[in-house]
């Protein structure tokens, strides 16, 4: 994990002496290289969830070292024993892609986190979370772009955004200020950076998913 951005970079392999793929490259690549060496694996590709700097900062180093292609679009691939599906999940960014590996794990980039979702276009984020991720099995591991992993089932049960979007909980009604604009706080959740995440509706009817540091309670 990169200590300033708290961004994750991953490497997975089908077996020792087999095939490996990287997922994002925003963190120091030394642990990834060490893992590949320990496994005696042959890298086949870099899977890029999106092109924000905190996810690609060290991508050029991996490409220079291993001369492998970057995969950054939806599709299906098979490398050795690794079966990978790329799913379009726009919202946090237009180019966001999640990668499902077999029936075991999904790399969600900055769309779905432990207890939170990514900031961005609310309608697109909601569709990506509810129509794509919540269609996956409950026991599937969620490996996000930042900090701790979770599972689809846990987020279905406990993620405040998912609970409201699924109808399990009502939208909030608290009045707040967001950057000098009056708004209603529809959802509040913890977030990986410790500042929280909020879905708000402004008085003109527009919505936004914003970092919690931008939200001021009216009573404060």
PLM features per residue range, with description:
Residues 1-39, 98-109, 115:
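Conserved beta-strand hairpin/beta-sheet module of binuclear metal-dependent hydrolase folds
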Residues 46-56, 87-96, 142-150:
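Histidine-centered catalytic micro-motifs
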Residues 57, 115-120:
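A short acidic, helix-capping loop that chelates divalent metal ions and anchors anionic groups
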Residues 38-42, 79-82, 136:
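Glycine-rich phosphate-binding loop signature in dinucleotide/nucleotide-binding domains
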Residues 29-73:
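Active-site metal-binding motif and surrounding structural segment of the metallo-beta-lactamase
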């Amino acid at each position: 994990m990169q200590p300033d951005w708290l961004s994750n970079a991953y490497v997975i392999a089908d077996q020792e002496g087999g095939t490996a793929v990287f997922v994002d490259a925003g963190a120091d690549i030394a642990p990834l290289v060490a893992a590949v060496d320990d496994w005696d694996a042959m890298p086949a590709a870099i899977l890029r969830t999106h092109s924000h700097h905190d996810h690609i900062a060290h991508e050029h180093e991996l490409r220079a070292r291993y001369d492998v292609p970057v995969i950054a679009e939806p599709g299906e691939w098979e490398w050795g024993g690794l079966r990978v599906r790329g799913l379009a999940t726009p919202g946090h960014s237009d180019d966001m892609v999640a990668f499902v590996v077999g029936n075991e794990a999904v790399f969600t980039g900055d769309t779905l986190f432990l207890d939170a979702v990514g900031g961005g276009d609310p309608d697109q984020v909601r569709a990506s979370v509810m129509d794509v991720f919540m269609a996956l099995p409950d026991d599937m591991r969620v490996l996000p772009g930042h900090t701790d992993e979770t599972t689809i089932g846990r987020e279905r049960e406990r993620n405040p955004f998912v609970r409201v979007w699924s109808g399990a909980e009502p939208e909030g009604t608290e009045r707040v200020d967001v950057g000098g604009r009056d708004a209603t706080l529809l959802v509040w959740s913890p977030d990986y950076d410790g500042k929280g995440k909020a879905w708000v509706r402004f008085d003109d009817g527009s919505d936004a998913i914003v970092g919690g540091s931008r939200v001021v309670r009216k009573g404060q």
